[in-house]
Amino acid sequence: MGRARSGPKRHVKRLAAPYAWPIPRKEGGKFAPRPYPGPHTMDTSVPLLILVRDMLGYADYAREARKIITRGEIYVDGVVRKEPKFPVGIMDVVEIPRTGDRYRVVMNEHHRLDVVPISEEEARVKVCRIKNKTYVRGGNLQITMHDGKNWLVEIEDPTDPKEDVYSVGDSLVLELPEPDSGESWKVVDHIPFEEGVWVYAMTGRHSGEVGRVVEIQTFEGPQEDLITVENPEGDQFQTTKGRLIAIGKDEPLVTVRKEE
């Protein structure tokens, strides 16, 4: 009789790791670190160790990457993260104050998680997709974002919630705190998902593409809205609403593609 498993797996086989992880499959050992359960899904995030070693190239080996992380040199969304298995995902802002480097985590056109360099000013901006909304005790509205953040909207009159102007699929623009400031993020704007807004494809066949919404097709029943997007070159593609995130009204507010 085999020995019972004592707990969750600590690692994942490289060959079985999510396709989005930009790691060698047949080199560097048999296993890769498994991210802790956290704000992102395993398919749309990587452990911080992989980001530091494989995506940023700050270390050649896992041991070196762990030292960098546990020394408190890596900040995610303005908060220091010292756990090598902390999941870092799409739209997260990564900062290394010692080097002055700043990056945004994205899904590129090859369906791989990637990082794009951003400015000091842009490092204070993050766009989050509204994933869910629920009313909680007291009649207030709780909004859950795609990265696991929760935002409480105070409702003055629960029988007439005029403050609830948000829909699942809309985006919230966050102002992120400076590293070590002790402050928290705050919501500074709302981007309704509607025709004319700029969107970025986070997943799916068109991942990494950016354009404006030109048509929204809605259906009765559980079928998801079908969105037609036109890129800056005038080419169009279609995808479902759940694969897109609105990133700006008149222009994109954040950088999601590397300069060619």
From Swiss-Prot:
MF GO annotations: rRNA binding; structural constituent of ribosome
CDD domains: KOW_RPS4, S4
Keywords annotated in UniProt: Ribonucleoprotein, Ribosomal protein, RNA-binding, rRNA-binding
rRNA-binding found in the keyword field: yes
Cellular compartments per GO CC: cytosolic small ribosomal subunit
Domain S4 RNA-binding intervals: 46-111
Membrane-spanning segments: none
Any Pfam family the entry gives: Ribosomal_S4e
InterPro entries per UniProt: Rib_uL2_dom2, Ribosomal_eS4, Ribosomal_eS4_central_region, Ribosomal_eS4_central_sf, Ribosomal_eS4_KOW, Ribosomal_eS4_N, Ribosomal_eS4_N_CS, S4_RNA-bd
GO annotation, biological process: translation
SMART domains named among the record's database cross-references: S4
HAMAP family found in the cross-reference section: Ribosomal_eS4 (MF_00485)
Similarity-based family: Belongs to the eukaryotic ribosomal protein eS4 family.
Protein name, UniProt field: Small ribosomal subunit protein eS4
Organism field: Methanopyrus kandleri (strain AV19 / DSM 6324 / JCM 9639 / NBRC 100938)
Gene that encodes it: rps4e
